[in-house]
């Protein structure tokens, strides 16, 4: 369970992705329950239906619930009428049984987080296993008889041609009525409290919806600057702080397709959509002619569940999820064919196809060895870096650590984190020895890091510190202002930049020069006020993200500037607006 809201998750460590997997798992098992002819397959698949549905409910994923309904309707449309009827009946039965045991399982699970009791733990499993076993018995022994009965009664009915649309259309109407029912406070109060809380506030003003809309708008702004081939792998994580509309923190735009467009541009997105269209069109065309279609339908269900949910989440960012999805797509695009008798070639000469196979196998083997070499080199560099950081100043002397970092950079000269670690250690050496050679070396690696990844968030702090350590306050201020244009929501950088500008302005003031640096400090203060106004203009339901406000440090500096300029009214105004009065009690 996640802390606070008790949303169940898995080693994936994300409830929404777990919900997507449970959606796929439910549809696969429930589909096999009503379609497979093998009793053993039906035995195992039916036993897993209720655990999958219960797990989905316990994720409390609103997007997951919505995708579940959409996929359920789509699956109904592609099934024949008799299977639709069976699927509907067995799904309703699974839903009723799951909702029946849900309150007990939920209460036991929540209580176990604070007061683990082995008896309650066993009771929870017993309830789940009994419900699953009952559902399995119904599926294994009653569904085949129900199937034969329906075949006998409905085979000769005249409405058979259009009957397959009756249940899906009726289900759509039921979904609409259910959605309307969720707007009724009296009806929704009949649900258990956790479900009531999650379903009761489904609307476009809900914070997760508003935040996603903000992510998508900012994502499209990135695409505008990198329209064709995109900004490269990991682009969102590197760029979003430069484009964000408010100081939120997220490593993903919460949409697989948007993230793909950001990284690979419109060319990459079009190729992805074309590939998906090819697979799905080929799969649909094989429906009649492919004898293995019913088995491939399972992979269609799984891939569609994840891909549809990925419209509003980042499930595909997990390597094992995306790998399995593309495996499903590969199976969907294939088809079962009859075995072709092998033609034996006579004579001493090997067929040309065999030579091609050998050449292909050899080239792929060489490529695999090369990739394995570079991968092993990268893994070794990472382990060496991690070990050095952990043992620094404990078992490894600082000078030895620096030499190790140089070795790591020889292996991976353009890795941002390795460069940043080396810069940090060089600056620490300067603090100890006051030898500016270390700062020059640090600046060399800073320049390299800016060339390799100019958007890396760790650069500004170390570059500014390098100038400050050299006592180049003017250079530090100029660099700070440059980076503030790139990262307009970095509160710490605003404070440090305004502090530097105040120092430079004071030097100009004492030398009877025009303190233009104070003007720049006031401009940054006005920029901060505009940023604060943007946050205040956000809907009440939307979370603003990181704290961004006019701090006491900034307020005192700006008030000090106005004081030296003789503008006492603004001095008092700034302090009254942003500095809390002292508690004299």
Where are these regions (language model features)?
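N-terminal intrinsically disordered, acidic low-complexity segments at the extreme N-terminus
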Residues: 314-343
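Aromatic-rich transmembrane-lumenal/periplasmic boundary elements in polytopic membrane proteins
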Residues: 1, 175-225
């Amino acid at each position: 369970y996640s802390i606070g809201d008790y949303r169940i998750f898995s080693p994936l460590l994300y409830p929404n992705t777990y919900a997507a997997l449970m959606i796929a798992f439910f549809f696969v098992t429930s589909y096999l329950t009503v379609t497979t002819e093998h009793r053993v397959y039906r035995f195992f698949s039916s036993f897993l239906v209720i655990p999958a549905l219960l797990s989905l409910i316990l994720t409390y994923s609103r997007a997951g619930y919505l995708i579940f309904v959409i996929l359920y309707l789509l699956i109904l449309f592609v099934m024949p009428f008799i299977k639709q009827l069976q699927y509907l009946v067995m799904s309703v039965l699974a839903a009723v049984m799951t909702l029946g045991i849900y309150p007990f399982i939920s209460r036991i699970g929540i209580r176990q987080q604070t007061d683990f009791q082995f008896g309650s733990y066993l009771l929870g499993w017993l309830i789940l296993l009994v419900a699953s076993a009952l559902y399995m018995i119904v599926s294994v022994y009653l569904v085949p008889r129900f199937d034969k009965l329906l075949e006998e009664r409905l085979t000769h009915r005249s409405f058979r041609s259009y009957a397959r649309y009756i249940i899906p259309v009726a289900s759509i109407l039921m979904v609409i009525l259910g959605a309307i029912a969720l707007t009724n406070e009296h009806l929704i109060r009949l649900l258990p409290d956790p479900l009531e809380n999650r379903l009761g506030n489904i609307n476009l003003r809900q914070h997760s919806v508003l935040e996603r809309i903000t992510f998508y708008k900012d994502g499209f702004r990135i695409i505008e600057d990198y329209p064709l081939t995109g900004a490269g792998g990991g682009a969102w994580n590197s760029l979003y702080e430069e484009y964000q509309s408010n100081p939120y923190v997220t490593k993903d735009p919460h949409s697989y397709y948007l993230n793909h467009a950001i990284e690979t541009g419109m060319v990459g997105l079009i190729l992805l959509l074309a590939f998906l269209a090819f697979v799905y069109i080929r799969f649909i065309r094989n429906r009649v002619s492919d004898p293995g279609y019913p088995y491939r339908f399972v992979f269609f269900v799984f891939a569609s569940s994840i891909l549809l949910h990925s419209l509003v989440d980042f499930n595909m960012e997990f390597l094992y999820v995306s790998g399995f999805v593309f495996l499903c797509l590969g199976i969907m695009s294939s088809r079962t064919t009859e075995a072709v008798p092998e033609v034996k070639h006579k004579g001493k000469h090997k067929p040309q196809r065999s030579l091609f196979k050998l050449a292909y196998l050899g080239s792929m083997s060489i490529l695999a060895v090369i990739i394995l070499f570079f991968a092993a080199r990268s893994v070794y560099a990472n382990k060496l870096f991690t070990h050095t950081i952990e043992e620094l100043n404990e078992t490894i002397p600082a000078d030895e650590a620096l030499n190790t970092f140089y070795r790591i950079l020889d292996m991976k000269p353009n890795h941002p984190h390795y460069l940043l670690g080396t810069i940090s250690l060089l600056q620490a050496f300067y603090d100890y020895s006051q030898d500016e050679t270390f700062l020059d070396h640090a600046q060399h690696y800073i320049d390299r890091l800016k060339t390799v990844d100019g958007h890396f968030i760790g650069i500004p702090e170390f570059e500014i510190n390098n100038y400050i350590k050299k006592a180049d306050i003017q250079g530090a201020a100029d660099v700070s202002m440059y980076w503030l244009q790139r990262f307009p929501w970095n509160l710490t950088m605003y404070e440090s930049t305004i502090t530097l500008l105040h120092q430079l302005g004071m030097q100009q003031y004492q030398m009877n020069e025009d303190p233009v640096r104070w003007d720049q400090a006031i401009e940054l203060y006005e920029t901060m006020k505009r940023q604060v106004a943007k946050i205040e203009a956000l809907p009440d339901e939307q979370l603003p993200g990181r704290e961004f406000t006019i701090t006491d440090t900034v307020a005192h500096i700006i008030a000090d500037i106005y004081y030296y300029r003789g503008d006492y009214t603004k001095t008092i105004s700034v302090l009254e607006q942003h500095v809390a009065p002292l508690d004299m009690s």
